[in-house]
């Protein structure tokens, strides 16, 4: 069988980004009726067509980029440029992120803290892969819980 596209010569149904799979990145829901929201994605995850993934060449910028993508500035730009319910990777890649050296450490630290708080909150629910026990049972004794 020939799995190549007759027009382009590329093999169909093939992952062209093998260098990036399972790498740390930023993901977002591509289809949303609400505001754009980006999430940190740790190593070991795959992207999909409605859960796109942004990979940074320099991973030390990941939390800075995550903070920018979740900012009011990005939200306003995306409301103008993505007037449908679909947040496509091309639109996200066109956002004008500028790294400000004077604020880099502070923004990165705040973003990292927000990711930790969100993860801890998510992990308190049974649907999380990292769920251990309900937060109501976190007291030192069952009686204090």
Question: What positions do the PLM features span?
Answer:
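S-adenosyl-L-methionine
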Residues: 1-145
């Amino acid at each position: 069988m020939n799995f190549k596209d007759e027009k382009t010569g590329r093999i169909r149904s093939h992952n062209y980004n093998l260098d990036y799979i399972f790498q740390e990145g930023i993901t977002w829901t591509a289809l949303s009726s609400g505001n754009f929201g980006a999430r940190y994605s740790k190593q070991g995850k795959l992207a999909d067509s409605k859960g796109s993934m942004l990979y940074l060449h320099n991973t030390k910028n990941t939390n800075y980029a995550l903070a920018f993508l979740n900012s009011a500035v990005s939200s306003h730009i995306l409301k103008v440029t993505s007037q449908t319910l679909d947040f496509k990777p091309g639109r996200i890649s066109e956002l004008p992120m500028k790294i400000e050296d004077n604020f880099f450490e502070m923004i990165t630290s705040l973003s990292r803290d927000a990711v930790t708080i969100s993860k801890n909150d998510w992990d308190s629910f049974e649907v999380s892969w990292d769920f251990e026990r309900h937060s109501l049972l976190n007291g030192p004794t069952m009686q204090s819980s």
